[in-house]
Curated annotation (Swiss-Prot):
It is an enzyme of class 7 (translocase). It comes from Sorghum bicolor. InterPro entries: NADH-Q_OxRdtase_suN/2, ND/Mrp_TM, Ndh2_N. This is NAD(P)H-quinone oxidoreductase subunit 2 A, chloroplastic. Its main location: plastid. Belongs to the complex I subunit 2 family. NDH shuttles electrons from NAD(P)H:plastoquinone, via FMN and iron-sulfur (Fe-S) centers, to quinones in the photosynthetic chain and possibly in a chloroplast respiratory chain. The immediate electron acceptor for the enzyme in this species is believed to be plastoquinone. Couples the redox reaction to proton translocation, and thus conserves the redox energy in a proton gradient. It is a multi-pass membrane protein.
């Protein structure tokens, strides 16, 4: 009898929760239409996987890519609409949030073609892989529009959990298992530190969770200059540091890059940076409005350490993926300059512009690494020697992406860094910009070292891997080369036509 009553209560409670969720979606669903498209794509993937056999694999890629493209289209149609706060203040829609959502969707759209051949060669489970990618994308999109502390905590956890599962997707690879364990432990620690900082912010503001209400609460309680806010700032900055992976919070990055499947690394290397940057701009700029000098100082220290340590350690690496891991640490130092400058002097516009170029440069580089790794089975930098003699297209594509990452003119990376450093200089960050310029020159050295290996034609320097190099007979080879070509073009052409990109980026204000 007791069990029967408890069962009825459980059914009633579940029904109430379902009806409340349905009511919220009915009246607020139009505000998250791009996210709803991804949810529909996830459900469709599951249904097809349950009702079909493995011969329908092309449908999985088609549904995933189509849902991402339609979601991007929905975002573009919503561009320049008035800012809207929905879901009882938990979610905000404006141009600034939408540009980050667009970048995350763009990353995922380009990463899926990179994974096709790798998944077929390694015989990984395709459905679960795509589900994790789409769910991580969904978490990143909700993070970009999050307007309260609870959503800001839950959304990145959704992204992080999928990232842990993706990094350990090749279960029989010991390096992948080690990378996943380190990633999981560091991610769990960072989340606990972040939520502890949120608790200080919550208490100091008088129990407010919405970002703007926290500011009002701090004014009402006269706590905006209290030690509690300083403690909250330190904990939140440390928690954000593990998400952004600047030095000295970069310990997990090289191991995860080296041990995870290469398409997963390509996905995480860009989407995690975009999502974490969106989180940093909102959580630091709004609740810590009265502590701007303090968090500027903290971020300046992180930027300097990242630019110096990241580029110095990248020189000594022998693995291509570890080199790109340390390179990404240096790159995030440049992005932090834009976060520090903020709305003044087009800081956010320069950060968004550089991040757009970084996506194309980084994904183009990883596309080349995926192709080379599948055809040779090696990741060592020295094994790339003489690649130009066997595959000129792949060698030239990799060289262009590396040169753009280094910031050589007239490629997109040069103009992105130029605009970013110029905005930093106008804001008075002379020392920070000087460090950025010096470390950019330093990064060109190790990029050119790889390009020299690619272009060498002497037989004694060509490794057996390149000497026995063979193109893959798989049809899916076309998709990864198409994605690589798009990224290479995007790393080159935007340098010539910067004005439209800058105009769009300058429209993205709170």
């Amino acid at each position: 009898m007791i069990w029967h009553v408890q069962n009825e209560n459980f059914i009633l409670d579940s029904t109430r929760i379902f009806m409340k969720a349905f009511h919220l979606l009915l009246f607020n669903g139009s505000f998250i239409f791009p996210e709803c498209i991804l949810i529909f794509g996830l459900i469709l993937l599951l249904m097809i996987d349950l009702t079909s056999d493995q011969k329908d694999r092309p449908w999985f890629y088609f549904i995933s890519s189509t849902s991402l493209v339609i979601s991007i289209t929905a975002l573009l149609f919503r561009w320049r609409e008035e800012p809207i706060i929905s879901f009882s203040g938990n979610f905000q829609t404006n141009n600034f949030n939408e540009i980050f959502q667009f970048l995350i969707l763009l990353c995922s759209t380009l990463c899926i073609p990179l994974s096709v051949e790798y998944i077929e060669c390694t015989e990984m489970a395709i459905t679960e892989f795509l589900l994790f990618v789409l769910t991580a994308t969904l978490g990143g999109m909700f993070l970009c529009g999050a307007n309260d502390l609870i959503t800001i905590f839950v959304a990145p956890e959704c992204f992080s959990l999928c990232s842990y599962l993706l990094s350990g997707y090749t279960k029989r690879d010991l390096r992948s298992n080690e990378a996943t364990m380190k990633y999981l432990l560091m991610g769990g620690a960072s989340s606990s530190i972040l939520v502890h900082g949120f608790s200080w912010l919550y208490g100091s503001s008088g129990g407010e969770i919405e970002l703007q209400e926290i500011v009002n609460g701090l004014i009402n309680t006269q706590m905006y200059n209290s030690p509690g806010i300083s403690i909250a700032l330190i904990f939140i900055t440390v928690g954000l540091g593990f998400k952004l992976s600047p030095a000295p919070f970069h310990q997990w990055t090289p191991d995860v890059y080296e041990g995870s499947p290469t398409p997963v690394v390509a996905f995480l290397s860009v989407t995690s940076k975009v999502a974490a940057s969106a989180l940093a701009t909102r959580i630091l700029d709004i609740p810590f409005y009265f502590s701007s000098n303090e968090w500027h100082l903290l971020l300046e220290i992180l930027a300097i350490l990242s630019m110096i340590l990241g580029n110095l350690l990248a020189i000594t690496q022998t693995s291509m993926k570890r080199m790109l891991a340390y390179s990404s640490i240096g790159q995030i130092g440049y992005v932090i300059i834009g976060i520090i400058v903020g709305d003044s002097n087009d800081g956010y516009a320069s950060m968004i512009t550089y991040m757009l170029f970084y996506i194309s440069m980084n994904l183009g580089t990883f596309a080349c690494i995926v192709l080379f790794g599948l055809r040779t089975g090696t990741d060592n930098i020295r094994d790339y020697a003489g690649l130009y003699t066997k595959d000129p297209f792949l060698a030239l594509s990799l060289a262009l992406c590396l040169l753009s990452l280094g910031g050589l003119p007239p490629l997109a990376g040069f103009f992105g860094k130029l605009y970013l450093f110029w905005c930093g200089w106008q804001a008075g960050l002379y020392f920070l910009v000087s460090i950025g310029l010096l470390t950019s020159v330093l990064s060109i050295y190790y990029y050119l070292k790889i390009i020299k290996l690619l272009m060498t034609g002497r037989n004694q320097e060509i490794t057996p891997y390149v000497r026995n190099y063979r193109r893959s007979p798989l049809r899916s080879n076309n998709s990864i080369e198409l994605s690589m070509t798009v990224c290479v073009i995007a790393s080159t052409i935007p340098g010539i036509s910067m004005n439209p990109i800058l105009a769009i980026a300058q429209d993205t204000l709170f």
